[in-house]
C-alpha cells in the first residue's frame, strides 16, 4: 500500500520545515515526514531547505555563516507572514529537537542532506550520531541529490537506510540503486516510467516520488504502486489514497 509523506511538513498550509508544519502533518494518518538538514557555523544540524534564510525567514544570509543562536533569534514564517503566531514553533528547529518530538510517534522521516552547493563536512556523521542517540535507524531514510553523500552515509554506518534523489531520471534505476548498495530511489514523479517501476521492483528497491500535489498524478502513482508519495498537500494525498482502496 502506498503511503503519504508530508513534504517539509504540512507545507501547503503552514510554514515549511517548522515544528508547526510537522505537528500539523502528524495530526493526519501519514506514513511520514520529509525534511531538509544543513550545518550551522557552529556545527549544529538544523532543518531548512535553502542554503540561505532569505526566502523562509525575517532574516538574511547563508546558514553556514550563522550560529544556532543567530538563527534562533529569527522567525521562519516564509509565505505565511502575518498568518501565524511568532513563537517557538516557527523558529528554526534542530534535528535533535525534531527527534525529541518525533521519537514517541508511529511514523517515519525522510531526511534530505542538502549537500548540493556546500559539502558540509561532518554532516553525515552528525546525523548518524543523532539517529543512534535516539535509536531511530528503522524509522529514518536519508536522501540526497549528491549520490556520493549517500555512499558516504553507507560507509559511516551500513545500518543507515539511504535513498537516491534524481531530477531527470536514471537508466535502469533499480540496477543503479542496488549496485551502489542503497535502499530507495527518489525520482521527480514526472520522470518515473512503467519500465522504471519494473526494474526497481525486480531489484527490491523502494520508490518515494516527489513532489506530487494533484489528484490525477497521485492516482497514477498509487496505481503504479510506488512506496510513498511526497506531497505538500497532506489532506489531498490521504483523500486520494483512501478513495483508491
Where are these regions (language model features)?
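Phosphate-group recognition and catalysis centered on beta-loop-alpha active-site segments
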Residues: 1-245
Amino acid at each position: 500500500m502506498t503511503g503519504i509523506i508530508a513534504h517539509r511538513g504540512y507545507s501547503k498550509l503552514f510554514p515549511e520545515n517548522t515544528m508547526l508544519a510537522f505537528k500539523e502533518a502528524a495530526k493526519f494518518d501519514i506514513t511520514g515526514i520529509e525534511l531538509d538538514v544543513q550545518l550551522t557555523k557552529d556545527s549544529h544540524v538544523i532543518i531548512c531547505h535553502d542554503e540561505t534564510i532569505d526566502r523562509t525567514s525575517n532574516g538574511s544570509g547563508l546558514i553556514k555563516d550563522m550560529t544556532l543562536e543567530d538563527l534562533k533569534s529569527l522567525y521562519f514564517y516564509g509565505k505565511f507572514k502575518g498568518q501565524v503566531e511568532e513563537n517557538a514553533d516557527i523558529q528554526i528547529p534542530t534535528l535533535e529537537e525534531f527527534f525529541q518530538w518525533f521519537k514517541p510517534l508511529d511514523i517515519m522521516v525522510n531526511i534530505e542532506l542538502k549537500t548540493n552547493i556546500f559539502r558540509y563536512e561532518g554532516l553525515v556523521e552528525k546525523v548518524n550520531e543523532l539517529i543512534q542517540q535516539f535509536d531511530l535507524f528503522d524509522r529514518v531514510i536519508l536522501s540526497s541529490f549528491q549520490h556520493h553523500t549517500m555512499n558516504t552515509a553507507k560507509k559511516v554506518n551500513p545500518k543507515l537506510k539511504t535513498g537516491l534523489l534524481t531530477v531527470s531520471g536514471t537508466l535502469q534505476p533499480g540496477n543503479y540503486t542496488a549496485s551502489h548498495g542503497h535502499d530507495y530511489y527518489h525520482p521527480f514523479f514526472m520522470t518515473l516510467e512503467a519500465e522504471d517501476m519494473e526494474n526497481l521492483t525486480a531489484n527490491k528497491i523502494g520508490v518515494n516520488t516527489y513532489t506530487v500535489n494533484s489528484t490525477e498524478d497521485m492516482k497514477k502513482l498509487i496505481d503504479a504502486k510506488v512506496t510513498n508519495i511526497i506531497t505538500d498537500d497532506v489532506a489531498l494525498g490521504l483523500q486520494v489514497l483512501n478513495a483508491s482502496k
